[in-house]
Amino acid sequence: MTTTGDHGQEEDAPLRRAPQLAVLVEGGDRKGLLHDMTAAILRHGGDILSVEIVERGARSAVYWELDGVEEPESLERAFLEIDVVTRLRRLPSMFQVYGKRIIVVGAGAQVGQVALGAIGEADRHNIRGEKISIDTIPIVGEVALANAVRAVGRLPRAVALVLAGSLMGGEVTEAVDELRERGILVVSLNMAGSVPEHADLVVTDPIQAGVMTVMAVATTALFDISRVSGRRF
């Protein structure tokens, strides 16, 4: 099992593990529908981990991920008793389907190479029961990069960020510090600027950076990020 220091707490974080219940509630749409659904969840002692409006308009589809529901079957009946609800389905949660998310941000060429390493390594762990997915966005510019880094903290199931580029600093560095405070692992390519000095791990080769990031978050890997934190490879 991976031991990752502060980042090893990810299994206990609500958005980084499977919820108790994942349901898709479908039917018509009207004002107050979400209010009625949340009231039903409250009556059954549930905590809302995630909600997504999949469809709205003439019809609605709302996907819920919930914890702490005292009687799941009773909650499902309560949903179906809402006047416009016509169908309810239990589904595998997003964590069960897509698992932990690694986000790769930066210049296109480097992002592609990091993704190559990360996807190849994730495949090795996913076939052994782990679930790790790789998200990428090629983007440049200090403000755009800083916004992208900060947004990782709002992404469900995001556990690590890889910054892939040739020069990053300034506001991007501030965003990196904020993200690390939220317990998200930050890996940086060895580049110009102040970002590498603030990352958990600095790797020169982009393919190896992708590989090492996956190893750091996979429960099926024996890799202690705390033992190499702050070092450059």
State where each predicted segment sits.
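Conserved mixed alpha/beta catalytic, RNA-binding, or beta-rich assembly cores of soluble enzyme
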Residues: 88-233
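A conserved regulatory-domain signal marking ACT and ACT-like small-molecule sensing domains
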Residues: 1-107, 111, 121, 136-140
